[in-house]
Curated annotation (Swiss-Prot):
InterPro entries, A to Z: Phosphoketolase, THDP-binding, Transketo_C/PFOR_II, Xul5P/Fru6P_PKetolase, Xul5P/Fru6P_PKetolase_C, Xul5P/Fru6P_PKetolase_CS, Xul5P/Fru6P_PKetolase_N, Xul5P/Fru6P_PKetolase_ThDP_BS
Biological source species: Clostridium acetobutylicum (strain ATCC 824 / DSM 792 / JCM 1419 / IAM 19013 / LMG 5710 / NBRC 13948 / NRRL B-527 / VKM B-1787 / 2291 / W)
Lineage per the UniProt record: Bacteria, Bacillati, Bacillota, Clostridia, Eubacteriales
Keywords for this protein: Lyase, Thiamine pyrophosphate
The keyword S-adenosyl-L-methionine belongs to this UniProt entry's keyword annotation: no
Enzyme Commission no: 4.1.2.-
Entry protein name: Probable phosphoketolase
Sequence similarity: Belongs to the XFP family.
Length: 796
C-alpha cells in the first residue's frame, strides 16, 4: 500500500537545529524535575545556592525521570508533526515529576492549578509542593493532569493503555513500561494484549520499554539478557521491536526522533490499510526498547561510587538538604549543568522558542480529554429492566438461573449502545460458565488471532465481549482503562478468583477517592464487579474455589466509594444491576448465583426491596406487627434459601413462635448512617432487628464481617452463621452443613437462644441432630442430597 510518509506538515522535521531545541526542552524538564526534589527557593539559581534554599527533608526519586522526560519531549514532536491524538501512560514507579514538569512547561498545569503560575512564585510553589506535606505525590497521582495510571503499585500500565484505546480508533497511547515493572505478573501477561486490538475499530498502543537497568537495589532481568534474546522475546509476543540505545544525548536525540517517525508511520499505515480494506488481520504492532542509564544526566559519582547508570540513582542521588550540606556544591553543579539561564526568560517562564515545541490545546498530552474521561462520558442507554421480570406467582414456586436472566438484559444493553460503542463486558474465559448466554445472541468475543471453526465458538474480530484471555489482571486493567477514558462496562468472574485482583480494585478505589475531591476531574462510570460461581455453589470445583473474602476487602474501603449487593433472586439482581450501571464513581460488587434457584420476589417487590436495601419479608414472617420472639436474617442467595427453610421448620414445630424475617440486599445498610451513606439510622435498625431479641443471621461470607458491620448497634444478641473455611467437592447442602449455615443448624441456634422454649425446644434440637446424622449417612451412600432437601418448597 501507499505510504503516508510526506503527507504531513513539515513541522517537527528532523534537523540539527530542531534536535538542539528538543535537547534544550529536555534540559528544562530535567532541571525543574531536580528542583522539585530539592528546592524551596531560588528555583532558577539566579543567585548562589544556599542551605536556606533547600527543603528540610528531601523525599522523592530520580532514576526514571530523565529517561521519561526524554521520551515526553520526543512524543511532543510527533504529536505536532502527525497531528496525533495521544495520551501518556507512565508505568515505572515514582516518576511523579515527569508529567508535572512537562505539563507545567506546556502550560496545562497552571491552567488546572492557577496558583502554580508560570512565574517566580509559581515555580517556587511547584518545587515546594512535591513530596511535601499538603503537596503532591511522588507518583503520577490523580492530581497530575494527563495521568490515568499512578504507577504506585506496579504492573498495570499496559493493561490500562489497551483499555483506553478500545473503541477509540483515533487515540494512540504511548505507554512507558519500566523494566522493573516488566517483571510483575500483570505486566508480563499484558504483552499478549495485542491479540485483542482491532486496527479498524480500536486505537493503538505504543509500548516504550524503558531499560535503565535497575530497580531499587537490583539489576532488572530484561536489561541483562542478550539483545537478540530480548528481541526474540518481543517478536515471539507479536511485536516489532525497535531499539534506541545509548547515553550520548546528541546521538540519542537523532536516533529517537528517527525511530519515532518510523513507528508512528507504521501505526498510521497499519490503521489506514485496515480501515480502507476492512482488513482485521492481526498486525505486528511496533514498540520501542529505550536503553539509557538510570539517572541519566545526573551525578556520575557520589562519595566516590558510581551513581548515574547504577541502582544508587533510583531515589535521591545526592544526600543534601538544609541540615546536611556536604554535597551542596555538587548539587549546584548538577543543576547548573542544565544551563537554566538559556531555558527560561527574565519572568521565569520557558523561552518562546521552546514553548513552540509543545502541542497546543487538547493536543497536549496533559490536556487530552481522554485522560479526564468524565468529560467524554455519555449516559449508557439501558432497557427497562422490569421488562425482563421473572414471573413469581408465589414465593419459591418458580425456579430460574439468575445469571441467565441477567444475560437477557445485558444482551439488550449491548444492542442499545451499538452505535456509540461505549459498553464492554470483560472476564477471564468465564462469560459462558457464568451463564451470560444470551449476550452471545447479539455480539461475540473480540479475538484477533486465528479462528478455527467449527472448533471455536463466538469468536470474531469485532465484539463487545473481551473474555478470551485467562488473566484476571488483564481483564481488570482493561476495564479500568476503558472506564478511565469515559466508557462503561463490567467484569464478571468467579467469586474466589476476583481476589486475584483485589489489590487492583483497591488502587482503583484510591484513584476514585482522590479524583472525587478534584473539581477538574469529572466523574467516570462505576467499576461494576459481578462475583458468581460463588462459595456455596461448588459442584466440581472444591476448596480452592471457596473464598467470599472480597466482601470484607471492599467493606474496609472509603464508604463514599464502595457498595456491596447480595441479591437473593433474579428480579432483585436485575434491579440491582440496572441501578449499578447508572451510578458514577463507585465500586459496585454484586455477589450472585448462577445455578437453578427458587425465586422469591415479584419484580415490584424486588424494586422496593432494592430501593430500601434491607426489608422485612412479610410473607416469610408471622409476627404481624408485634414484637417478634426471634429475628431470622439473611444476606446472599444460599443463606436466604436456608434461612427460609429454617423458618418453615419453626412454623411447623413451634407454630406459636413469632418469627420476623429480614433480608439484606445492600450490605452497607448494616452500618450506622454516620459511617456509610447507605447506613441505617439506629432507629430504623432497631425497628427491624429490635434492641434485644435474638437475631440469627445467615450470611454469605465470613461471619465476623457482620459482627464488624453491626459493632455499634444496640442489639448485641446477634448470632451469625457464615463461611468457616470448611468444604470440598461435596453436595450443595453438605457445603452448608459443614459450615453450619444449613437450616438444621439455624433452627438449633434459634432454640438455644430461646431458653423459654424448654422441653419443646429440646425435642426440636434432637430432631435437628437426627436430621444431620441422616444427611451425612445419605450423601455418603447415595452421592446426592436428601430428597427433602432437593425437593424442598416454601410453605406456611
Amino acid at each position: 500500500m501507499q505510504s503516508i510518509i510526506g503527507k504531513h506538515k513539515d513541522e517537527g522535521k528532523i534537523t540539527p537545529e530542531y534536535l538542539k531545541k528538543i535537547d534544550a526542552y529536555w534540559r528544562a524538564a530535567n532541571f525543574i524535575s531536580v528542583g522539585q526534589l530539592y528546592l524551596l527557593d531560588n528555583p532558577l539559581l539566579r543567585e548562589p545556592l544556599k542551605p536556606e534554599h533547600l527543603k528540610r527533608k528531601v523525599v522523592g526519586h530520580w532514576g526514571t525521570i530523565p529517561g521519561q522526560n526524554f521520551i515526553y519531549a520526543h512524543l511532543n514532536r510527533v504529536i505536532k508533526k502527525y497531528d496525533l491524538d495521544m495520551i501518556y501512560v507512565s508505568g515505572p514507579g515514582h516518576g511523579g515529576q515527569v508529567m508535572v514538569s512537562n505539563s507545567y512547561l506546556d502550560g496545562t498545569y497552571s491552567e488546572v492549578y492557577p496558583n502554580v503560575s508560570r512565574d517566580l512564585n509559581g515555580l517556587k510553589k511547584l518545587c515546594k509542593q512535591f513530596s511535601f506535606p499538603g503537596g503532591i505525590s511522588s507518583h503520577m497521582a490523580p492530581e497530575t493532569p494527563g495521568s490515568i495510571n499512578e504507577g504506585g503499585e506496579l504492573g498495570y500500565s499496559l493493561a490500562h493503555s489497551f483499555g483506553a484505546v478500545f473503541d477509540n480508533p483515533d487515540l494512540i497511547t504511548a505507554c512507558v513500561v519500566g523494566d522493573g515493572e516488566a517483571e510483575t505478573g500483570p505486566l508480563a501477561t499484558s504483552w499478549q494484549a495485542n491479540k485483542f486490538l482491532n486496527p479498524v475499530t480500536d486505537g493503538a498502543v505504543l509500548p516504550i520499554l524503558h531499560l535503565n537497568g535497575y530497580k531499587i537495589s537490583n539489576p532488572t532481568v530484561l536489561s541483562r539478557i542478550p539483545k537478540d534474546e530480548l528481541e526474540k522475546f518481543f517478536e515471539g509476543n507479536g511485536w516489532k521491536p525497535y531499539f534506541v540505545e545509548g547515553e550520548d544525548p546528541e546521538t540519542m536525540h537523532k536516533l529517537m526522533a528517527e525511530t519515532l517517525d518510523i513507528v508512528t508511520e507504521e501505526i498510521l499505515n497499519i490503521q489506514k490499510n485496515a480501515r480502507e480494506n476492512n482488513d482485521c488481520s492481526r498486525p505486528k504492532w511496533p514498540m520501542i526498547v529505550l536503553r539509557t542509564p538510570k539517572g541519566w544526566t545526573g551525578p556520575k559519582f557520589v562519595d566516590g561510587v558510581p551513581n548515574e547508570g547504577s541502582f544508587r540513582a533510583h531515589q535521591v542521588p545526592l544526600a543534601v538538604d538544609r541540615y546536611h550540606t556536604e554535597n551542596l556544591d555538587q548539587l549546584e553543579e548538577w543543576l547548573k549543568s542544565y544551563k537554566p539561564e538559556e531555558l527560561f526568560d527574565e519572568n521565569y517562564r520557558l523561552i518562546p522558542e521552546l514553548e513552540e515545541l509543545t502541542p497546543k490545546g487538547n493536543k497536549r498530552m496533559a490536556a487530552n480529554l481522554h485522560a479526564n474521561g468524565g468529560l467524554l462520558l455519555r449516559e449508557l442507554r439501558t432497557p427497562d429492566f422490569r421488562d425482563y421480570a421473572v414471573d413469581v406467582p408465589t414465593p419459591g414456586s418458580t425456579v430460574k438461573q439468575d445469571m441467565i436472566e441477567l444475560g437477557k438484559y445485558v444482551r439488550d444493553v449491548v444492542k442499545l449502545n451499538e452505535d456509540t460503542r461505549n459498553f464492554r463486558i470483560f472476564g477471564p474465559d468465564e462469560t459462558m460458565s457464568n451463564r451470560l448466554w444470551a449476550v452471545f445472541e447479539g455480539t461475540k468475543r473480540q479475538w484477533l488471532s486465528e479462528i478455527k471453526e467449527p472448533n471455536d465458538e463466538f469468536l470474531s474480530n469485532d465484539g463487545r465481549i473481551v473474555d478470551s484471555m485467562l488473566s484476571e489482571h488483564l481483564c481488570e486493567g482493561w476495564l479500568e482503562g476503558y472506564l478511565l477514558t469515559g466508557r462503561h462496562g463490567f467484569f464478571a468472574s468467579y467469586e474466589a478468583f476476583l481476589r486475584i485482583v483485589d489489590s487492583m480494585i483497591t488502587q482503583h478505589g484510591k484513584w476514585l477517592k482522590v479524583t472525587s475531591q478534584l473539581p477538574w476531574r469529572k466523574d467516570i462510570a462505576s467499576l461494576n464487579l459481578i462475583a458468581t460461581s460463588n462459595v456455596w455453589q461448588q459442584d466440581h470445583n472444591g476448596y480452592t474455589h471457596q473464598d467470599p473474602g472480597l466482601l470484607g476487602h471492599i467493606v474496609d474501603k472509603k464508604p463514599e466509594i464502595v457498595r456491596a449487593y447480595l441479591p437473593a433472586d433474579a428480579n432483585t439482581l436485575l434491579a440491582v444491576f440496572d441501578k449499578c450501571l447508572h451510578t458514577k464513581h463507585k465500586i459496585n460488587l454484586l455477589v450472585t448465583s448462577k445455578h437453578p434457584r427458587q425465586q422469591w420476589l415479584t419484580m415490584d417487590q424486588a424494586v422496593k426491596h432494592v430501593e430500601q436495601g434491607i426489608s422485612i419479608w412479610d410473607w416469610a414472617s408471622n409476627d404481624k406487627g408485634q414484637e417478634p420472639d426471634v429475628v431470622i436474617a439473611s444476606c446472599g442467595d444460599t443463606p436466604t434459601l436456608e434461612a427460609l427453610a429454617a423458618v418453615t421448620i419453626l412454623h411447623e414445630h413451634l407454630p406459636e413462635l413469632k418469627v420476623r424475617f429480614v433480608n439484606v440486599v445492600d450490605m452497607m445498610k448494616l452500618l450506622p448512617e454516620n459511617e456509610h451513606p447507605h447506613g441505617l439510622s439506629d432507629k430504623d435498625y432497631n425497628a427491624l432487628f429490635t434492641t434485644d431479641k435474638p437475631v440469627i443471621f445467615a450470611f454469605h461470607g465470613f461471619a465476623h464481617l457482620i459482627n464488624q458491620l453491626t459493632y455499634h448497634r444496640e442489639n448485641r444478641n446477634l448470632h451469625v452463621h457464615g463461611y468457616m473455611e470448611e468444604g470440598t467437592i461435596t453436595t450443595p447442602f453438605d457445603m452448608r452443613v459443614q459450615n453450619k449455615l444449613d437450616r438444621f443448624n439455624l433452627v438449633k441456634d434459634v432454640v438455644e437462644n430461646l431458653p423459654q422454649l424448654g422441653n419443646r425446644g429440646a425435642h426440636l434440637v434432637q430432631l435437628m441432630n437426627d436430621k444431620l446424622v441422616e444427611h451425612n449417612q445419605y450423601i455418603r451412600e447415595v452421592g446426592e442430597d436428601l430428597p427433602e432437601i432437593t425437593n424442598w418448597q416454601w410453605h406456611v
